[in-house]
Amino acid sequence: MPRPSPCADSGGGMMTTLTARPEAITFDPQQTALIVVDMQNAYATPGGYLDLAGFDVSTTRPVIANIQTAVTAARTAGMLIIWFQNGWDEQYVEAGGPGSPNFHKSNALKTMRNQPQLQGKLLAKGSWDYQLVDELVPQPGDIVLPKPRYSGFFNTPLDSILRSRGIRHLVFTGIATNVCVESTLRDGFFLEYFGVVLEDATHQAGPEFAQKAALFNIETFFGWVSDVETFCDALSSTSFARIA
């Protein structure tokens, strides 16, 4: 049975049901946000941080194309689109010093310490690395949020932005599935948001099993998993059913 929207009895909404794992989920697109996580040169382009740190980014182009498709469908359906950019100020104060676990675990910070010539070039606001990829351009009405850690809920206004608009459902795309996408979806789960990830609009940092493990965790414990074609079909005009 489809998981009903908590807003299903509000009246007058346009509901759609998205086929997903482990079961379908019903939601109102206008009370749903599409979250695009960290589609920056750092994570999706050769010469960016992940590439320089030794992660494979050679298969990110189809993900970018799928995100373009999902964004277009979401915008047409009246969904709020929120873009995240991960990174810090040019002096890396926001990244934290030795007293922060982020200092020790961030692969970007470790890469710069190991390769001093990269200092100031990775994930620094204003840098090429920090910029969104050329193919993905926010439009008027979209919201672009910087974030200093993996989760988009940590030290950002995301929660208040969503609650003030009555949004309870979040559809996730972006990189990396097993890091920032999963972290944000998990935090959303703890804050009572319904999270769906579009698996072919995401990409892992690390081997393929990291992608599979993240998707398993999400569909089993924290949310739902679908794909871009199914999402677009659900948002097509023939899929909507007006609530009486």
Swiss-Prot record:
Q: Which domain of life is it from?
A: Bacteria
Please verify whether the record's keywords include Zinc. no
- Record's keyword annotation contains Hydrolase: yes
Q: Name one GO biological process term.
A: uracil catabolic process
Record's CDD domains? cysteine_hydrolases
SUPFAM superfamilies the UniProt entry points to: Isochorismatase-like hydrolases
Query: Which enzyme class?
Result: hydrolase
Q: Give induction info.
A: Up-regulated by the nitrogen regulatory protein C (NtrC also called GlnG) and repressed by RutR.
What Pfam families does UniProt report for this protein, alphabetically? Isochorismatase
Transmembrane region(s): none
Q: What is its EC number?
A: 3.5.1.110
Please list the GO terms describing molecular function.
hydrolase activity, acting on carbon-nitrogen (but not peptide) bonds, in linear amides
Entry annotation: catalytic residues: 38 (proton acceptor), 147, 180 (nucleophile)
Which reaction is the catalytic activity of this chain? (Z)-3-ureidoacrylate + H2O + H(+) = (Z)-3-aminoacrylate + NH4(+) + CO2; (Z)-3-ureidoacrylate + H2O = (Z)-3-aminoacrylate + carbamate + H(+); (Z)-2-methylureidoacrylate + H2O + H(+) = (Z)-2-methylaminoacrylate + NH4(+) + CO2
Q: Which keywords annotate this record?
A: Hydrolase
What family does this chain come from, according to its entry? Belongs to the isochorismatase family. RutB subfamily.
Role noted for this protein: Hydrolyzes ureidoacrylate to form aminoacrylate and carbamate. The carbamate hydrolyzes spontaneously, thereby releasing one of the nitrogen atoms of the pyrimidine ring as ammonia and one of its carbon atoms as CO2.
Name of the protein: Ureidoacrylate amidohydrolase RutB
The gene that this protein is the product of is rutB
